[in-house]
Design a protein with these regions (language model features):
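Catalytic/RNA-binding core of pseudouridine synthases
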Residues: 1-213
Length: 213
């Protein structure tokens, strides 16, 4: 097979897990994915098969759109709910407080990459250092948030839709918004609903693809 398969990645799978299983389904070693998703994230994961793998490097630069749930009042070492709690604060915010802060995170901004990431410093991946309890200085990197929409706020959880450039960490965006609101926060859920020209409506659940394994 030569082509692109749009997978709806389930929670708990790494992007590499998905491609490893699909190698068996399509009986080929030439397979790659566009845009890594963390294990806790779900949604659009384009998988390039056969000659189509040439397109992976170009696709990496595509804009991505996510829907995320920000849990306010809790800060963790991984910037999401899977991590160890570093701080907890009571949340006393109004919808107006939210709308006052969100504009700071739209447009061209600088973002400090998280320690729990695959970025390398002096040849070592940051998450490897983080697991050893080490923290190193990271330089802020320019990103673009094209859209940041409040989908709902229940007093402690803020649902957001984010359209952003390559290299944007949604976990970090969640924590930074929580810090700006004065109570801290971490990412509770993440779903990629669009990657480049591929929409979640185009995606096939992974379990459906594995039925032919």
């Amino acid at each position: 097979m030569n082509g692109i398969v749009i997978v709806d990645k389930p929670q708990g799978w790494t992007s590499q897990d998905v491609t490893a299983r699909l190698r068996r389904v399509y009986a080929t070693r030439r397979i790659g994915h566009g845009g890594t998703l963390d294990p806790m994230a779900t949604g659009v994961l384009p998988v390039f098969v056969g000659r189509a793998t040439r397109g992976v490097e170009f696709f990496e630069h595509a804009e991505k759109t996510y829907e995320t749930l920000l849990l306010l009042g809790r800060t963790t070492d991984t910037q999401d709910v899977t991590g160890a709690t570093l701080a907890e604060k009571a949340v006393h915010l109004s919808p107006a407080d939210i709308e006052k802060v969100l504009p700071r995170f739209r447009g061209d901004i600088l973002q400090v990459p998280p320690m729990y990431s695959a970025l390398k410093v002096n040849g070592k991946k940051l998450y490897e250092l983080a697991r050893k309890g080490q923290e190193v200085e990271r330089q802020p990197r320019p990103i673009t948030v094209f859209e940041l929409t409040n989908l709902g706020f229940d007093g402690t959880r803020l649902s957001l839709r984010v359209k952003c450039s390559k290299g944007t960490y949604i976990r970090t965006l969640c924590q930074d918004i929580g810090d700006a609101l004065g109570c801290g926060g971490c990412m509770e859920a993440l779903r990629r609903v669009r990657a480049g020209e591929y929409d979640i409506e185009d995606a096939v659940p992974l379990e459906q693809l594995l039925e032919s394994e």
